[in-house]
Amino acid sequence: MEEIKGYVEHIVYRNEDNGYTVFNLNNDDGDLTCVGKFHYIEEGELLELTGEYIVHKVYGTQLQVETSKVCQPEDKVSIERYLGSGAIKGVGPSLAGRIVKKFGGDTFRIIEEEPERLAEVKGISERKAREIAIQVEEKKDMREAMIYLPKYGISTTLAARIYQHYGQSVYRVIEENPYQMADHVPGVGFKTADEIASKVGIHTDSDYRIRSGIFYTLIQSVSEGHVYLLQEVLLYRASQLLDVEVQHIEKYVMDLAMEKKVVLKESDEGLRVYSAHYYYMELTVAKMLHDLNVDFDVTPSVLEHRIHMIEEQAELALDDRQREAVMEAVRHGILIVTGGPGTGKTTTINAMIHFFEEEGADILLAAPTGRAAKRMTEATGCEAQTIHRLLEVSGNPEDDDKRDKVGFGNGFGRNAENPLESDVIIIDEMSMVDLPLMKALLDAIMPGTRLIMVGDGNQLPSVGPGRVLKDMIASDCFPVVKLEKIFRQAKESDIIVNAHKINRGEPVILDNKSMDFFFLKRSDPNVIISVVITLIQKKLPKFVDASPYDIQVLTPMRKGNLGVERLNKILQQYLNPPSPQKQEKEVGDRLLREGDKVMQIKNNYQLEWEVCTKYGMTIDKGLGVFNGDMGIIKNINTYEETVTVEYDEQRQVKYPYAILDELELAYAITIHKAQGSEYPAVVIPLLQGPRQLYNRNLIYTAVTRARKCVTLVGSDSVFQEMIQNTSEQRRNTSLAERIRELA
């Protein structure tokens, strides 16, 4: 084991999540590259290191650091070097030289014990002397905290965030009530706080723990789409989480209401418990929708004439419902247009665009996902953006505090203070828009703007909380035009014809005489998987003229023989087998490999992406990768500990190893995750599953994801049963009620 002492000359690379750092160390023998994990280091610091020399095949000789210790510089040269390194704001090399010239080896004692004497140095006022002393003390305090916090399993990034919030109070917080961190520090949840509490000996029936556990249970229900829980359901779930009897925790719900963290509302179904955040979010969305829902003064005969003129100029043949949709869009501040595949939603959008362009209106088009926005652009010939990009999502960490627990909120560049400058906003795939995203969108819309929402009300609800489209329709307070006619060209597609049969609850004929809709009857899960592999590898690529990577397997479940997790492990071995040329990285019980098809499974507003030429020149860059984005792993860099993924439009994103839990293999995905996307072909393995999940909405959504070919493999009886099953997983929302209260 080598022992080396020297100065941190330059930090080449640092992974803030796990502390992995590459830096140049300057010592008596010259410069040396060092690699290892460090809680906290800065350029200019004096380190004592132990480690082993290694030879990297690309970067040459390095010191693989095992242990490190920060030393306070003792000689004049060392002190001057540290102070002038930039570690202390406002002190450069010149001023550092004057300080050390004045106080010599006694400099740090002077700073710590007699900071006012720094004013004896030319260029330092009494105020600046105090600032320098405070910074030196803060550096020392933070370094101690960055060593203390990781003992509780906290990452370096999270440790820094905790210290920035609490400062020197962090020790008291950890010892007395770590649960408060779940409320105040992004990235700390109940379970992290509970683990810390267990390590410091806080009892399981602590008031702090029970209150935090109840609130955590309520917030967790958001991931199921709920905006509230009935009190009896909340108490039962919380008691299971906390392992505490229901009667011992009931009184704490009222405590949370007194603290204004939750809102209690009586209803016919029982006492509703909302987090205050979502309760007021629903109220705000209802109020903003009410304010936008104005009528515009339009002469009917003039409007009809202008629509006919648009039809002739744009060579559009609208039916009565489509024409009605255009008229309603002109008459009202809010319009909802619904319809299944092949009913002319795109033609209707195009007619609206032509009409408003003729009027000289500014129009913005957007959709919830990148794929949906791309499809909207191709269908209209006008640029469409994701709603996030339209709202200019912020990657500033300070904006994390403005976002709610599922990652949405006010962390957008466009908002009430900086609204969108547009006369008309058209949103496609509206069924995917959840309550927080709707709130952010409405925040950025100026009074007098027309908002047109287009979607398929029979698809699955949004992944996030709420069911905005269905609640707006259910309120009966907004104009709704339902497109039902299937146009001639669409009638030639059995995908579209069968989708409408499914929607009407009619049996689908499975005789395989179709050109684009097939059912292969199999009963054994392993046989089904074998058929799926053959379809993707050999049959479908030629049939639909697409790469195997463009053919998507959709399955109802995550777990089980035909669930996402098992399918992905098997499909990975066939579609992207291991090779000496491909780097790999284990992430828990999963393996990521160069060439793998992957999906981002949560919103990350701070991840940077860039588009580069083949020569490495950056031609575009931005922030944010979002839930449902799909890409290919291009590179796994074991030296930097990063994984590079290329998404649509050649956007490349570098993931530090520490956040690889945000990526999943995507050879197979759940039907829910496929919302808003369209693929050349989909393959749907299907055997018996839970009735509440295996319903008409689910199979309808799956079938309508395919552009050229649908192939189901499995049980035809399960398929027909799903068509007849109209039960839905209940979502606790009250937006429709809030809207009606304002009408």
Q: How should these model regions be labeled?
A:
Residues 627-743:
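C-terminal accessory regions
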Residues 315-331:
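N-terminal pre-P-loop "Q-motif" helix
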Residues 337, 365:
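Hydrophobic anchor at the beta1->P-loop junction of P-loop NTPases
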Residues 345:
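Conserved lysine of the Walker
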Residues 348, 352:
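Hydrophobic positions on the alpha1 helix immediately C-terminal to the Walker A/P-loop
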Residues 457-623, 742:
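Conserved helicase motor core of P-loop NTPases
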Residues 1-305, 743:
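Accessory, non-ATPase domains that flank or precede helicase/AAA+ motor cores in DNA-metabolism machines
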Residues 328, 355, 359-361, 370-374, ...:
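Conserved helicase motor core of SF1/SF2 NTP-dependent helicases
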